[in-house]
């Protein structure tokens, strides 16, 4: 199950540079993080759902690529985003 429209709008307004900024790297990473966190709860209950696990791994990979891009382009924004999202790096 994906995020609700309200949850996505909240993330966009919180991490975006404007109200309708859904394309910035920070917003994309925040949306992927929310979806990943939601799926982790799903896998606690459905351990053998390998089809969805592949989608989860794809999301994690996409988030990693976006974070690497942001780190190359602007280290300050990268560090701030990692801190706000509570990611390990």
From Swiss-Prot:
Checking CDD domains in the record gives: Ribosomal_S15p_S13e
What are the recorded Gene Ontology BP terms? translation
- Extract one GO molecular function annotation from the record: structural constituent of ribosome
Extract the Pfam families matched here.
Ribosomal_S15 (PF00312)
The record's InterPro entries line, in alphabetical order, gives: Ribosomal_uS15, Ribosomal_uS15_bac-type, uS15_NS1_RNA-bd_sf
State whether keyword Glycoprotein applies.
Answer: no
Q: Which controlled-vocabulary keywords does the entry list?
A: Ribonucleoprotein, Ribosomal protein, RNA-binding, rRNA-binding
Taken from the UniProt entry, a GO cellular component term is: cytosolic small ribosomal subunit
Main role? One of the primary rRNA binding proteins, it binds directly to 16S rRNA where it helps nucleate assembly of the platform of the 30S subunit by binding and bridging several RNA helices of the 16S rRNA. Forms an intersubunit bridge (bridge B4) with the 23S rRNA of the 50S subunit in the ribosome.
| Family indicated by similarity | Belongs to the universal ribosomal protein uS15 family.
Quaternary structure and partners: Part of the 30S ribosomal subunit. Forms a bridge to the 50S subunit in the 70S ribosome, contacting the 23S rRNA.
Q: Which HAMAP family match?
A: Ribosomal_uS15_B (MF_01343_B)
Q: What is this protein called?
A: Small ribosomal subunit protein uS15
Organism of origin: Klebsiella pneumoniae subsp. pneumoniae (strain ATCC 700721 / MGH 78578)
Upper classification of the organism: Bacteria, Pseudomonadati, Pseudomonadota, Gammaproteobacteria, Enterobacterales
